[in-house]
Amino acid sequence: MSPGEAPAAAGTYPAELECDVLLLDGRSARLRAIRPEDAPTLRAFGAKLSTETVYFRFFSPRRSIGDEEIAHYVTVDYFDRLALVAVVDGELVAVARYDRCTDSPPGARAGGDAASGQGMDDAEVAFVVRDDHQGRGLGTVLLEHLASAAVQRGIGRFVADVLPENYRMINVFRSVGFDEHALLDSGVIRVTMELASRPEYIERVEGRDWTAAVRSIEHILRPASIAVVSAGSQDGSVGADIVRNLLSGGYTGAVLPVDPQAESVCGLSSYASLSDVPGPIDLAVITVARRLLSDVVRACGSKGVGGLVVVSSGASDDEAQSESSDRDLVELARNFGMRLVGPECMGVINTCPEIRMNASVAQRPPPPGRVAFSSQSGGLGIALLGEMGARGLGVSSFVSLGNKADVSGNDLLRFWEADAQTDVIVVYLESFGNPRKFSRIARRVARKKPIVAMKSARTASGRRGAYSQGAGTVPDEAIDALFRQAGVIRVGTLEELLQVTGLLASQPLPAGRAVAIVGNAGGCGVLTADACESYGLEVTELSPRTQQRLAEAVSRGVATSNPIDLADSATANEYRRVLEIVLEDEAVDALVVTFTPPGPEGAEEIAQAVAEAASSATKPVLANFIVTDGTLSALRSGPRRVPWFAYPESAARALARVAPYAEWVGRSEGIVPSFDDLDVGAAREIVTEALAGQAGPFEVVPAATTARSVWLDTASAFKLLEAYGIPILPWVRVSSATEAVDGARSVGFPVALKLDAPVLVHKSDVGGVRVNLGSADEVAAAAEALLTRFGPGVSLVVQPMGPEGVETVVGLVEDPSFGPLVMFGFGGKQAELLRDQMWSLVPMTTQDVRELVSGLRSSPLLTGYRGSALVDLSGLGEVLSRVARLAEDIPEVAEMSLNPVVASADGAVALDARVRVETVLHEPPLLRRAMRTA
């Protein structure tokens, strides 16, 4: 069990285990620990079990579960004995439990290692699911959550006995990761599962989570029937508008208006209540007044509705009240197994020919296409839909997320990955709920389909506005790191969002950054070339063969170097032929075509030539036509649309956003390195002792509070690094001049003498550092001066002088939303001034490390810039990887700064370290927690 990790004490009800989970059919269930008052419910549960299910659970036929057994099952201490129950629609439908084996060594009490499972206890485990709920994944998800709770309580392995003919239970155990070990003499099969996190176990959990999320969204985006609640009979009412949009859009399913005040809506008979609707309802779109929401959601649950889209406002303008009301609404929906979009959303759209659903307030939805779009801002989302339609950019589906109380961007990303109608995904975000989960999901999805994201609130004023709208704030550097690692294309403006999306939706990805430019005005070509270079693209040299072919193709003679100027007399045929030749040049990865009127032929004729040349190209073609209107129908028709840009800078910028994504897709993801020399136990002991000790000079939060935050003294910080194999200069901690001299002799002259004061960012600023001390007399004098200046009781640290090399800084910060963030930059006294830094989320792959090291403005200093010495990049990368691993293993490390880390040809070594630790409450491992959104 990790230091600082404190599950509920034995006998105390563990409220932290309560959560909502998604099942394989897309519905949800509530999980919680069993309580003594569950005895009547458990008795009713047992009465509904079939004879076969009872036999398989208890290995003997019986008619019912006795009162003594019931009392035993509901009486647990939540530590050595724990049971979780699943509740659906107020009824207990499944139970899973463990009992710690009495003959196991007391691993948890001895400080077992949860990461490896060593020194942990065994526990017997069993579960049973009510017959009418079997096959929904309840047993699997209960075991996953029970395993998570068990690890936190010092359990390292589950053991279970199963009858050979109980193939369903055996399959559930196998799906979770149990291994069959033996057929016992009693005729039962013994299965076991190690609870230490294993890649295959995490992969199984993610796979089940993925399937459940996709199926849950199908109720919302692929419904066979839709009830519009409070449809209203008057024109202009939101409900009536949605009914009208469903009908006018040709929705292929049943439209069911529900309004007690209306006899008919848009020519359809209206039902007085949901219970009056004959047949099943897949989706309910709710537009009632806020005060009626809970009653309507409850009625939907009783009817068995699959999903909800809540257009109504969830609460008042008070943010705290709104969040509380949203939580209550979601909890009510989850009690009936329903997913919920909203509240305060603008609806959902699916243009798939088999669905044709416009269950939104959008009067003019975009045409069918291959772009999926979600927006946290309802009004902005509807406006962008209209602009997409005006640009001829088709949409596969659209979801207005509103308050994002339940269904989130994470759910939609997983659905759209599997959606055959979607090629490009666009998300507009105002806040993150679970950014680490978003990162995991986006990294997988972006390998198959590009994700274009706009995250608002980048500036201080923007963050104030986001807060007033209920959107959370996180460091913008962290968001950049998240998007970069996950392959998400981040854009800064709405115009850029539309332009990049249009490029991705119509053109192939570039193979590199080499751009060719063809136009009929030299000035425009130069502007385009400048823009390309400024955005990190390369205006490439054309091959001699291409230049020869160009000279032959245009008889009047043109400049055949890149950018190519065809002059203002260029005809459509000349454009077409030149474009075809340039696109065949292997040195060219992308082509930007410019046109400036007037010319012998109009813009439409030139556009037709561009469209024809681009129709069979395997490289992206972008068109910059400086014309008074943007109709250019030729660019929008034909087998492949050509994206049009009003200005050359816009075309260059859009291409520059896409090129890094193409590189990301084409390179290896890398691996998360493993290390077999870590002393995790020693590291945890250092942290535990610091947090359990008496308040000292390095205490940040008063010890009277429930949480503690403490700066490690220098010796403890150095020992923590040593436990994780992070190179640190030899050191000796001393408290007198005599000890300082002895320490200097042991590490070797010349030495540095430093004040042991980790709360100080730069000890040199207060005169706390002496360097290049070459003799015992110099060391003694420096030590006396420091001890006199800073008073009795202080300690000093003696180290040899560091090697020559490049000073870098490696940092670590535990962000409450993003988790651990690793920072790399150029260090020393100038670190804050230069601000040449990059951030990365953990876990970090080898590719993430390479990008950190090579992505800084000053990175050439590491690779021999202007004759400087080469640096051992692998050694520097290993330091970063080890820091990332420490961040994963020891989440109590809230802040760390290794400044400087000197990188040289011989490797990388830290000269100093500041480490702050704090008590934390750990979130359980990877689990299906539907209430945690992003």
Language model feature labels by segment:
Residues 198-934:
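Catalytic-core regions of core metabolic enzymes
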